[in-house]
């Protein structure tokens, strides 16, 4: 194995181990939802938005969370405001995506905004946020143009991007539950 390949392998292995360890951490409510397409993820967003009350283990409201997820989809079509360096996207970022895709779910800091994205008011009305998420998903599914590189994962084709979006939404919505 060449030094460059060995380095890439070690970086990717370390990231994979860290990502798997994060999934095992006890961080309160985590339903561990898993979606690979946008349809079921949107269905869960609708279900939660219709609940009379929610329990959550995140700092963000459901409205703010849905806008954050919509931003990610929008940025995949029009470009992310800030990106990690190319070396990061091609090594650690690509490795993280591969681990998440292999597991069928992702984990990340649920209170970290997309780098450079406009701030999201926590009081964002859930109905408006859901409408924005649905519009973003519909636009993404109809999108015929080139997709922009993900700020961390780098270049993804449409199928991989849809899976990334679905896993992203699932990770966030896993931390909300409708109260009876």
PLM region descriptions:
Residues 24-29, 78-133, 140-141:
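Short, helix-capping/interhelical loops that line the mouth of catalytic, cofactor-
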